Amino acid sequence: MAESMLSLPTPLNISIWWNMGSILGMILGLQLLTGILLSMHYSSQLEMAFSSIIHIIRDVPGGWFLRLLHANGASLFFLFMYAHIGRGLYYQSYIIHPRVWMVGVTIFLVSMATAFLGYVLPWGQMSFWGATVITNLLSAVPYFGPSMVEWVWGGFSVGHATLNRFFSLHFLLPFLISGLALLHIIFLHDKGSSNPLGNLFHLSKKPFHPYFTIKDSVGFLMVFGVLLMITFFSPSLLLDPENYISANPMVTPTHIQPEWYFLFAYAILRSIPSKLGGVVALLMSILILYFLPLSSYGKSIPVSMNIIYQVLFWILVVTFIILTWLGACEIEEPYLSLAGPLTLLYFLMFLLLGMSNNLNFNLIQLK
């Protein structure tokens, strides 16, 4: 297996955007290591959860460092995952490698679930209220909703049973992500890596080792350096200050919001007046990635020759960034009015991305 990976024929012209996958693998390994070490000192007892985090920071040798590496590592993991998905979208990997794309989207979904469960574990104010608000979305499911919420909570409110099962699932899911990542790599080896030109010819390829292992090592060092700088100099940059306050069911935070990497979906959820409609839009904002391989009917034109596709892609990127900003804003005007049209634009761009290939293909045939 290792020999197969090292001798993988890799295109000579791949850019830095092809480094994201290996960087994600490194961060996943780091998250597994720090997570296992932290779990040795964490207590999922309702009365002890917040105190155990304080204990890790104050009393465990290097505990503060492990916790901050784990928390900020999750943010970097999603940052590079979005860059990885963006590269796949831009260079149309969903057409060239549909199975790789499908497994990748599944990894993304499981990662989001894992991150949400981990966000609840410190049992701070935002942990408690975030868990209450997000799990309560299940009540929008017709007929079965209220029963599903109580089943997830393990009672009539978020409490000890909720925290216990969230801790168990948060511990298990990263191993599922690792298995899916291995499947992702196996499917990638079926055709080999794509490149900016979109061809899969083996004439201009070199073995992965040593050329690209050295290149990836540079990326590892740079990313690890950035993670250390954030951890040492600005540890709370990507964290929510509300979570430094112990959970109190009697005091509601002024603004309940998830971590920054979920804000685009949160903005889409809030933009729909109907609760059920908002939940459906929230799910579809991610599940729509599954439908991309079906949208182009196997016709792939190199992105350098498809100006329409490039314009649509960058409109989607800008829309995503603005939705992320809106998700962090208060629930008031003009932010609510902006979220509606941008949600529509977000879904429209995915539809047009698939159609643009066929449109461009027909225009070329006409010429």
Swiss-Prot record:
Keywords: Electron transport, Heme, Iron, Membrane, Metal-binding, Mitochondrion, Mitochondrion inner membrane, Respiratory chain, Transmembrane, Transmembrane helix, Transport, Ubiquinone. Disulfide bonds: none annotated. The chain crosses the membrane at residues 20-40, 64-85, 101-121, 166-186, 214-234, 276-296, 308-328, 335-355. One of its GO terms (molecular function) is metal ion binding. It is found in: Mitochondrion inner membrane. Binds 2 heme b groups non-covalently. It is a multi-pass membrane protein. Its cofactor is heme b. Its main location: mitochondrion. Coiled coil: none annotated. This is Cytochrome b. It comes from Albinaria caerulea. The lineage of its organism: Eukaryota, Metazoa, Spiralia, Lophotrochozoa, Mollusca.
